[in-house]
């Protein structure tokens, strides 16, 4: 994006900038109200629902139009405009440790909701317990061999035992 998107807020209500999602690499066009006193704003990606932070820098003294060409939108965020990392007031006085990305705990908490976990089937419960039993009797057996034996034991199991309680393993 060129200086056409960076404009002074006098007379305008918002500033525009680009943020690249760190989860799915989608480039997002962000408008920040000029009245915002926050240095960092939260942005939610419409593609993956990931939440990232955009550094809200003070308005540049350049006054220009807000029109963006398609090439400017595809160019990605310019240096110093918006970033998905936390940053201080100026880039020159930063230490190397400040360049570290945001904590990984925030990335884990912002994942889109996954599918609901289903109750394991009777077969899965039986095989899981049977593998534990077989490995306790023969600790040197490979998992593949234990699984094969457990599957054979399931095949020879009377059907009455298979239909017992539907509680999870």
Curated annotation (Swiss-Prot):
A GO cellular component annotation in the UniProt record: nucleus
Region (Disordered): 63-122
Tissue specificity annotation: Expressed in leaf sheaths and flowers.
GO biological process: cell fate commitment; plant ovule development; polarity specification of adaxial/abaxial axis
Flavoprotein is among the record's keywords: no
C4-type ZnF: 21-48
Family membership noted in the UniProt record: Belongs to the YABBY family.
Name under which the protein is recorded: Protein YABBY 7
Organism per entry: Oryza sativa subsp. japonica
Lineage start: Eukaryota, Viridiplantae, Streptophyta, Embryophyta, Tracheophyta
């Amino acid at each position: 994006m060129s200086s056409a998107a960076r404009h002074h807020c006098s007379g305008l209500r918002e500033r525009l900038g680009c943020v690249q999602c760190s989860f799915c690499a989608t480039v997002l066009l962000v408008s920040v109200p000029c009245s915002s006193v926050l240095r960092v704003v939260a942005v939610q990606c419409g593609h993956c629902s990931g939440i990232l932070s955009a550094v809200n820098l003070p308005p540049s003294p350049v006054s220009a139009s807000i029109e963006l060409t398609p090439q400017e939108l595809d160019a990605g965020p310019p240096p110093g405009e918006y970033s998905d990392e936390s940053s201080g007031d100026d880039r020159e006085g930063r230490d190397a440790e400040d360049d570290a990305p945001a904590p990984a705990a925030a990335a884990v908490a912002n994942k889109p909701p996954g599918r609901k976990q289903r109750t394991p089937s009777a077969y899965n419960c039986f095989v899981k317990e049977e593998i534990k039993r077989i490995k306790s009797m023969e600790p040197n057996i490979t998992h593949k061999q234990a699984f094969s034996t457990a599957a054979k034991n399931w095949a020879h199991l009377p059907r009455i035992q298979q239909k017992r309680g539907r509680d999870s393993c």
